Amino acid sequence: MMSQADVLSGFDGFDIPDSPLGRPAVLPAVLAQMLIERLEEEKTIIVNQRLLDVDELHLQSLIMTAVQMGVWLLLTQGDQPAHGKACGLLSSEAALLSALSEGVHAGLIVSFRKPQEEQRKRLSLPASFFLGINLRDIAHVAQDERLIPYVLVRTERNAQLLGSLEQPSWDVKDAKDLLGQLEGLGFRSVLLSSPGDPASLADLLRWARNPYKGFQANTMGW
């Protein structure tokens, strides 16, 4: 991830996943600290936390860590663990309230696959932000200034990997069209992800920041 940070340094922030697909990985808070030390400019850093694997003690320790580091928290249930058993002791809503009570900028997942009524119910929670996943048709997207749509960018280098995921993905051309549509709907931020091909995100960022495109949204990379 550190090598990617240099390539993607033009982004406004970074989102760090927590054990993607339930597989072991370096703890997000560790990577976040490495990013903070490496980047010359102050960036928004979102640390993900899988709740399936932790108890209240771990959550409170993470909240204290987030306060000290000044990072945001994205609270998710996560995929079933590839090793061991899930704890399943914490709800996203309860974890959110705990984080907010300590002044942490904390968010939740909202799925655009759900009916808009369910999306609005989710958006009624007092989260600081929401990461919107499963974006297939912008006509089914609820409107909220706290929403950050998650856009997976598909290239020749990662097409096989992304094809194995349930999340929809977009080739570079379609991703550009989608960004324009999202801006037209009033979205101020978007999270772009292209696992295995960070260079494609750098190219997309240069396109989005072109003043002739008029794209003003903040962008985050993963």
Pin down the residues of each PLM region.
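Active-site pocket-lining/capping segments in soluble small-molecule metabolic enzymes
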Residues: M1, D6-L8, L74-P81, A86-R113, ...
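Conserved N-terminal beta1-alpha1 strand-loop-helix module at the mouth
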Residues: M1-A29
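Non-catalytic positions within long, well-ordered alpha-helices that form the structural scaffold/packing
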Residues: D6-V7, M64-V67, K121-L125, E183
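A structural motif
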Residues: F11, Q68-V71, L125-S128, F187
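Conserved beta-strand positions in the central sheet of alpha/beta enzyme cores
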Residues: D15, W72-L75, S128-G132, L191
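Acidic-and-aromatic substrate-binding clefts and catalytic sites of carbohydrate-active enzymes
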Residues: S19-L27, L51-L57, N134-H140, P198-A199
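Flavin-dependent oxidoreductase catalytic cores
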Residues: L21-L39, K43, S169-W170, W207
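Glycine-rich anion/phosphate-binding loops
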Residues: L52-Q68
